[in-house]
Amino acid sequence: INMKKITFVIPSRNNLEFLQLAYKSIRNLKGNHEILVLNDASTDGTQEWINSLGDNDLIVYHNPGPERIGIVGMFDKGIEMARTDIIMAFHADMVAAPNLDKHILKHLKRGTVVSATRVEPPLHPDGPEKMLMNFGIEVEDFDINKFNNWVSNDYQPKHGTL
């Protein structure tokens, strides 16, 4: 697929199972995007898993610790390290919906910011920037097929268009 590359900047700290799900969801997108994982002193096997991937479009920043940099510092570092002009801040516990990249690129115009709607389980209050839907709270409970089906068939954006 010939589309512009997006750099997905993902800070992570001891969030291996969610990070694996986030990584897989990005790799399932149509485009061959750059993923930049920033490991902030994780002790849960994150760095070993990253090292095992053999992904040429994966950039890694590893803070071996023991002092943490924190999520804001890691996002800043990731933006500095990105090799593409299009950057998406992505949390380790997020899942990329099918065609996320296509929709981001479709709406991106010079001088604009494009965002995606967050879909969260009903753990926190609703807000204008997110939708509350329960596809599972923990990795082992998350129903990716139900989520993908909802995105493909039933999802209507709160703001803007698809």
Provide a role label for each language-model segment:
Residues 114-132:
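Short beta-strand-to-loop element that shapes/binds the nucleotide-sugar donor at the catalytic cleft/hinge
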